[in-house]
Amino acid sequence: MNIFKQISSLIFSKLNELKQRGVISTSAANFIIEPPSNRVHGDIYTNVAMVLAKHEKKNPIEIAEVLAKEFELFDEVAKVEIAGSGFINMHLKIEVWHGILKQINELKTEFGTLDIGNNQAINVEFVSANPTGPLHIGHARGAVFGDVLANLLKKVGYKVTKEYYINDAGAQIDTLIRSVYLRYKEALGEKISIEKGLYPGEYLKPIGTGLAKKYGAELLEKQDNQVIRDYTLSSILEIIKEDMNLLGVNHDVFTSEYELQKSGKIEESIKILSDKGLVYEGYLEKPKGKESENWTSRKEMLFRSTKFGDDVDRALKKEDGSWTYFASDIAYHFDKISRGFNNMIVELGSDHGGYVKRLKAVVSALSDDQAKIEVKLHNIVNFFENGKPVKMSKRSGNFLTARDVVEEVGRDITRFIMLTRKNDMVLDFDFAKVKEQSKDNPIFYVQYAHARAHSLMRNAPKELPTADPSLLRTGGELFLIKTLAKWPDVVEIAARLCEPHRITFYLLEVAEAFHVLWGYGKSDLNMRFILEDNLNLTAARMFLVQALAHVIASGLSIFNIEPLEEMS
């Protein structure tokens, strides 16, 4: 039960009724309904009177007074108050909250599972790092974000495909092959010198050694050999998959840019755009910030992306006649649409912000506005040790890898901490803090709440009467129940906005409400969860504890994190 949607539905029905009775002239109100930030203002507030006032051209207080009388008739509502310039605050009956508590324990971890996706197919593309080396920590943030978002979308009823686009065409791959070829020669005993611009990483040595073992000297003088290319990319992709596996990330599909180009998908997709009159030969203006002496205007093949809200039209071919990277992007998204995906999400680093409008333009053009794409950007991660900036340099070379971080703090900690900030905000990751067993460590704080709940259930008397939730009436108990009741609403909002960090924030809120309630028992023995002389109240409180454990476990399952029943 999403109590906020339930009350919203009642309000909509009431507005339609009032319109039919001639009390108001419109019922179409895009109003807010959510829990107030201050508990004294009730359980739910809405600005519906203020929204209606604009349509009715009346004082919002006057409309609020009419609506308040009507809302008081709802079975779920105990009291209605008008606040400020027309806000309506509703206090729900205590029985509503007890009923939701029962529902949580009936549904267990399925509480919060929704069907807003209606089993629609959705493609979530994330990581898609160039296959030139191990995943660095920026990729790790994107990997966790994409994976958890995919899990979240599954929870709300979408049929999700997790995809990785292999950027295995272009200059960076040529550079990689030349770098591996040197390592191959080195493995055969030749002395090498790694020239500027090549990849110097030690991770390439085993690939060169593998080539030498498998082919001996057969590939010498064959730097551009397809065998070297295929072996290298296969080896690098295996490294990337191992890194992602350490993070708990697995993709369903890997799509190769190189294979797309070979299949003729670029030519096919460009022809479709051309047939729609969206490709032309023209000239681009000098980009802002570009020095005139470094800019030469030339006639180019262009895509009319400005027709779809982009800032400029986009070049499809380079000066040498080869396709641009953007042309490959067109082919790739044409391929997605051809596979039946009308809903797409792409995760990119914040340095790719300029791609957002052009990708939306392409998808809109190729699908005649039938397909939708959402581009989510992730920002950088700063690392600290006890508040001091640190740089880690291990076997991976001169950059911090995903493997380095997971091996330092563990998979679950890495996944959770990566979502303690909104994806487009800079994230600070303190190695010392995330290993602390304190409330300053977010994942510990949440896991400790779950473990504490299971400890209480293990230590409770074995023979308890049937739980009666109506015995739960203290402020702390009701606040925890109300916090748990928000879970379906949190899940839906997080999924609709593609913001899985909202789950993190909510779990911390739940953990805090529980820890505070547990703390009351230190100063007031009657507030303890287990009361040997009051088994009925103990049973009711264990019922609440059980519901809390279900909700936390449900939330952690979206992160693919195992909830702990005992802290080590």
UniProtKB/Swiss-Prot annotation:
Family matches, as SUPFAM superfamilies: Anticodon-binding domain of a subclass of class I aminoacyl-tRNA synthetases, Arginyl-tRNA synthetase (ArgRS), N-terminal 'additional' domain, Nucleotidylyl transferase
Protein name: Arginine--tRNA ligase
GO cellular component assignments: cytoplasm
Subunit relationships: Monomer.
Superkingdom to which the source organism belongs: Bacteria
Primary site of residence: cytoplasm
One Pfam family this sequence matches: Arg_tRNA_synt_N
Keywords on record: Aminoacyl-tRNA synthetase, ATP-binding, Cytoplasm, Ligase, Nucleotide-binding, Protein biosynthesis
PANTHER family hit by this protein: ARGININE--TRNA LIGASE, CYTOPLASMIC, ARGINYL-TRNA SYNTHETASE
Organism: Wolbachia pipientis wMel
Encoding gene (name): argS
HAMAP family, per database record: Arg_tRNA_synth (MF_00123)
Motif ('HIGH' region): 129-139
InterPro entries: aa-tRNA-synth_I_CS, Arg-tRNA-ligase, Arg-tRNA-synth_N, Arg-tRNA-synth_N_sf, ArgRS_core, DALR_anticod-bd, Rossmann-like_a/b/a_fold, tRNAsynth_Ia_anticodon-bd
